[in-house]
Amino acid sequence: MGTKESTQRRAQRVRRQIRKVAGERPRLSVHRTSKNIYVQVIDDAKGHTIAAASTLEKDLKGSLKTGADTAAAAAIGKLIAERATKAGVKEVVFDRGPYIYHGRVKALAEAAREGGLSF
């Protein structure tokens, strides 16, 4: 089994567990690359993205040193919490995908919790 296949299997395993516990709550999905981090609040029942944020946004790009550190992830966490709250979402299910809960993923999650999202 190659790296790509094992990554996809890990992500599917996490999402399967999320579907069991989610109920009606939307999913806070994280995607991480070596240079940036992206996050979306997704309503799986309707198939719509409620809110999204990334380190590629123009207003954030100038204020961040890089898009690939924990400070950038924390800024994105606060931003997604603000946007989700504005859209009327208070409770979400955290979808870390194939990434372990450590470093940038953990910083994003903690900042989103501080911003008002509960999961």
Curated annotation (Swiss-Prot):
Annotated transmembrane regions: none
One Pfam family this sequence matches: Ribosomal_L18p
CDD domains: Ribosomal_L18_L5e
GO molecular function, one term: 5S rRNA binding
Gene Ontology cellular component list: cytosolic large ribosomal subunit
One GO BP: translation
Keywords: Ribonucleoprotein, Ribosomal protein, RNA-binding, rRNA-binding
UniProt cross-references to SUPFAM superfamilies, sorted A to Z: Translational machinery components (SSF53137)
NCBIfam families assigned to the protein according to its UniProt record, in alphabetical order: L18_bact
Family listed: Belongs to the universal ribosomal protein uL18 family.
Subunit structure: Part of the 50S ribosomal subunit; part of the 5S rRNA/L5/L18/L25 subcomplex. Contacts the 5S and 23S rRNAs.
Function: This is one of the proteins that bind and probably mediate the attachment of the 5S RNA into the large ribosomal subunit, where it forms part of the central protuberance.
Name this polypeptide is given: Large ribosomal subunit protein uL18
Originating species: Mesorhizobium japonicum (strain LMG 29417 / CECT 9101 / MAFF 303099)
Gene: rplR
